[in-house]
Amino acid sequence: MVFPSQEEQIEKFEKDHVAQHYFEVLRTLISKKSVFAQQVGLKEVARYLGEIFKRVGAEVEIDESYTAPFVMAHFKSSRPNAKTIIFYNHYDTVPADGDQVWTEDPFTLSVRDGIMYGRGVDDDKGHITARLSALRKYMQDHDDLPVNISFIMEGAEESASMDLDKYLEKHADKLRGADLLVWEQGTKNALEQLEISGGNKGIVTFDAKVKSADVDIHSSYGGVIESAPWYLLQALTSLRAADGRILVEGLYDDVQEPNERELALVETYAQRNPGEISQIYGLELPLLQEERAAFLKRFFFEPALNIEGIQSGYQGQGVKTILPAEASAKLEVRLVPGLEPHDVLDKIRKQLDKNGFDKVELYYTLGEMSYRSDMSAPAILNVIELAKKFYPQGVSVLPTTAGTGPMHTVFDALEVPMVAFGLGNANSRDHGGDENVRIADYYTHIELVEELIRSYE
């Protein structure tokens, strides 16, 4: 099979008037800042998307009764008993903070050397326009769709999709029974293989706080008075072994072990090994798991307790000889199937009490359950086979990713097979400076989604 080069894909993209039209829509979307964490631009972007979909004949519903509006767009086939594909996407992005390095304005879509840059170009606005481009390209040559297509677009994905469960419960009757749900995004790995995955880890995040005194105390008392930071550090250390295993009683009892197929998929396709990880990130500390099989099992199928940040005492210039009265930390546990956020936090609370650290106060912030698809579902196998036609380096099929998203929420409401694949690359820098997508990959995603629609003829 002969595959087009990146240059040929760019040339096709530049000559494709449908792709060019929605590239301009993407340019507008990038320019419209929509950050849930800052409550900026959410209604404006939701309404703009609603108009874009209405113009091409979709039945559009915009629900502004939530903190971030939901946009649903339906394209109906006239065929009796037509199946349904759902595309789940989000229009919110993370901020483009001042500490991120951007070569150009993050809210101006720019193109350099065949690569497009901008906040949300991969996560996730570019996926919306690429998938709509695919649908419109199919409709150029056909009077009807062979399959019903629905888009669900939310504006709070980057903040744990806080209302998604309630929204889907309200609309479940019109969405249940779909043949397939295509997840918000995906990427190619470092070997240029398209990663096709069917799940993600969950998460529970929480704050830990300690107050040891009414005021900071002179550090000359350090030999006889316990300080908040020492107390907190000892408490946190008691929760994790040196090899990274979580030391919380009962936590692993409910973990759903991977089956043989899931282990085999990871062993065959996962392009993450200890040596590469160390090199990519310039690690100065040893890995918690050096042996590849144990590394992969830990990465994909086991929970992880992480410290996101610690704060206490004086951090200014020079010295300040004190015993800080307060200390706090932001923590998270990455969850796997079988673990529920509130239950995990309850177990941590009990373990801290048992370990003698009852003065540590815990505050739940957010949580999401984890999910793994059945990667042998016929609709998912169809995607895998179709993708092989478009990616010269092949595909990498993974039962789950180590990241987090609301897959469990969607499955719980709709009970539909879900698969993730997209237009990103191994260096797309989502959430960082110079977020980017190669134009060739963007256009290949359009072609694959169009072929997916055609496969239902």
Model regions and ranges:
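N-terminal helical capping/dimerization or prosegment-like subdomains
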Residues: 2-99, 326, 343
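Acidic/histidine-rich catalytic neighborhood of metal-dependent amide-processing enzymes
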Residues: 124-199
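A common structural junction motif
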Residues: 92, 239, 243, 349-358
